């Protein structure tokens, strides 16, 4: 809606779409590089801190709001995100089976996993250029270091290369423990990691 500068914020029109019960916690707003979109991480319900964190997209020219990531196309929370330089997709981190992976989602809502299923947690996500990302990564075996992720056309096939090895001199003196997945059956018959 248009802003009427002669009225206070309380008396402005509200952009409220049919069925939009946007009352939950919103955070991390970002404009797309081309300035056409505003995105933010959004929870649906007020006062429910375990609510799913979705990625909301607002098209500035039309006032249309949609969710490029929600439970329909990614069954986990959006942690952090950054826009691709061409404004056609968004890179994000999300936790799946106790590891934080990097994903890419287009404006068409198609989600592609960028990194593989290894036991690592990625964070501090940033775009370096059209083909590379910069991120921190740690695991149960290694402390945080910085990595360059070179994108690939195939899902889960990005090349991941360490550019720091801050604690390598310490880890080289230690025996490497073994880390294993352990799934247990829950009381309702499901599997839990």
What are these regions (language model features)?
Residues 1-27, 42-86, 95, 104-123, ...:
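Multi-bladed beta-propeller domains
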Residues 33-34, 85-86, 128-130:
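Residue-level detector of Asp-centered blade-edge/turn motifs that repeat once per structural unit
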Residues 35-38, 89-91, 114, 132-134:
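Hydrophobic beta-strand positions that form the internal "hydrophobic ladder"
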Residues 47, 99, 142:
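Short glycine-rich, flexible loops that bind phosphorylated cofactors or substrates
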Residues 93-95, 137:
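Conserved beta-strand positions in repeat-built beta-propeller and related beta-rich domains
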Residues 102, 193:
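Terminal RNA-binding accessory module
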Residues 126-152, 157:
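Structured, non-catalytic alpha/beta "coupling" segments that mediate domain-domain communication
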Residues 189-191:
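A structural signal for beta-strand boundary/capping segments at domain termini and interdomain linkers
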């Amino acid at each position: 809606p248009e802003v009427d500068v002669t009225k206070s914020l309380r008396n402005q029109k509200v952009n409220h779409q049919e069925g939009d019960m946007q009352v939950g916690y919103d955070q991390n707003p970002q404009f797309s590089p081309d300035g056409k979109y505003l995105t933010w991480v959004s929870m649906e319900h007020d006062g429910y801190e375990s609510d799913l964190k979705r990625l909301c997209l607002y098209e500035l020219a039309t006032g249309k709001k949609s969710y490029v990531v929600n439970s329909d196309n990614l069954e986990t929370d959006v942690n952090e995100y950054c826009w691709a330089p061409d404004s056609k997709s968004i890179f994000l981190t999300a936790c799946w089976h106790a590891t934080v992976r990097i994903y890419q989602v287009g404006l068409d809502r198609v989600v592609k996993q960028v990194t593989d299923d290894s036991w690592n947690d990625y964070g501090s996500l940033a775009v370096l250029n059209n083909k590379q990302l910069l991120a921190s990564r740690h695991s149960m075996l290694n402390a945080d270091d910085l990595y360059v992720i070179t994108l690939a056309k195939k899902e889960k096939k990005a090349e991941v290369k360490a550019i720091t090895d801050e604690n390598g001199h310490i880890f080289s003196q230690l025996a490497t423990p073994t880390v294993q997945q352990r799934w247990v059956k829950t009381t309702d018959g499901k599997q839990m990691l």
